[in-house]
């Protein structure tokens, strides 16, 4: 049986390290720390990539962009998202909507949420109202609550747009 919809979910986390900003949803956000990562460490785009890949059982971001590969050192995660979107479209799918939650005490995400939504919608060539970005804290519990890092969760609904390219 074949369905015209697929659901995927993704999660990413990075510890804070030296730096003066974090990348979130393709947007540079000033912060007292950067993140420790092989690429730019954008937890929003990484979680979104994993959700998209998972919906079609295509593995995870680490398989497609292994940290052992020097090509991805300090890479812009927008490249990852566009690659994942290309894989979906090659198979006749596209993102119907994405729902993303950032988990951290700081930086405050709210002031940047619209810019993140706009960037993601632009990268995926979907409507702005198909992208939700929100934030929560962990009430000072765990590594995010202690200000040691940042995490993101993403859920996507994919819709079939065409038969897969042969």
UniProtKB/Swiss-Prot annotation:
InterPro entries: MECDP_synthase, MECDP_synthase_CS, MECDP_synthase_sf. It comes from Xanthomonas axonopodis pv. citri (strain 306). PROSITE patterns: ISPF. Homotrimer. Its cofactor is a divalent metal cation. SUPFAM superfamilies: IpsF-like. The keyword Metal-binding applies. It is an enzyme of class 4 (lyase). Involved in the biosynthesis of isopentenyl diphosphate (IPP) and dimethylallyl diphosphate (DMAPP), two major building blocks of isoprenoid compounds. Catalyzes the conversion of 4-diphosphocytidyl-2-C-methyl-D-erythritol 2-phosphate (CDP-ME2P) to 2-C-methyl-D-erythritol 2,4-cyclodiphosphate (ME-CPP) with a corresponding release of cytidine 5-monophosphate (CMP). The keyword Metal-binding applies. GO terms for biological process: isopentenyl diphosphate biosynthetic process, methylerythritol 4-phosphate pathway; terpenoid biosynthetic process. The record marks 38, 137 as: Transition state stabilizer. A divalent metal cation binds at residues 12, 14, 46. CDD domains: MECDP_synthase. This is 2-C-methyl-D-erythritol 2,4-cyclodiphosphate synthase. Pathway: Isoprenoid biosynthesis; isopentenyl diphosphate biosynthesis via DXP pathway; isopentenyl diphosphate from 1-deoxy-D-xylulose 5-phosphate: step 4/6. Gene3D superfamilies: 2-C-methyl-D-erythritol 2,4-cyclodiphosphate synthase.
């Amino acid at each position: 049986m074949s369905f015209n919809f697929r659901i995927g979910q993704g999660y990413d986390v990075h510890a804070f390290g030296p730096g003066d900003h974090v990348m979130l949803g393709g947007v540079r956000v000033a912060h007292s720390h950067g993140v420790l990562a092989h690429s730019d460490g954008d937890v929003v785009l990484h979680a979104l990539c994993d959700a998209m890949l998972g919906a079609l059982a295509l593995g995870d971001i680490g398989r497609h962009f292994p940290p052992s590969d020097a090509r991805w050192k300090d890479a812009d995660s927008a490249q990852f998202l566009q690659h994942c979107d290309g894989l979906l479209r090659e198979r006749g799918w596209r993102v119907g909507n994405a729902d993303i939650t950032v988990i951290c005490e700081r930086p405050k995400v709210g002031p940047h949420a619209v810019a993140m939504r706009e960037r993601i919608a632009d990268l995926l060539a979907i409507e702005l109202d198909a992208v939700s970005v929100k934030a929560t804290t962990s009430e000072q519990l765990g590594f995010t609550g202690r200000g040691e890092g940042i995490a993101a969760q993403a859920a996507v609904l994919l819709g079939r747009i065409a038969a897969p390219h042969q």
